[in-house]
Amino acid sequence: SHIDHLKGLLKLAKEQEVKNVYVHCFMDGRDVAPGSGIEFVKDLESYMAEIGVGQIATLSGRYYAMDRDNRWERVELAYNAMVLGKGEKAASAVEALEASYHDNKSDEFVLPCVVNENGKIKNGDSVVFFNFRPDRAREITRAINDKVFDGFKRETLDLVFVTMTQYDKTLE
């Protein structure tokens, strides 16, 4: 996925007058430079302010949010931030990244961090997951949306969960 895809989704949300749009940022640091995430976040925040739609709710490094080797303890940390509002806290996404960089943790390894607790994923929400790589998206998708998930203890959520591609034939 690319930030332009996210901007397109935010623009569509504005056109459709969607309220309460929250972004859960998965930081990269591998396919782009390891410390470039802060510039992407600044660009995103500027765009959201410009169009008047969207707020960053959480940040997580791909090490946690996009695991692909059934390391559920990592995925659980990202899930807990996005759904339960638990984990590291920061007043802003930029502050969270600056703290991570200060601790010598690049974008890939940003600890799941809650920036806006109002953005927790909850029953009745719609989630648009716009990552195009199925291998990196399956586990967090299962944790959030799979009715028979058993990777760690969590409650089943009643969501509309939409992806940009099929991650796995067993996922609905």
Each model region followed by its residue ranges:
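…; additionally, a secondary subgroup of soluble metalloenzymes is captured
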Residues: 1-172
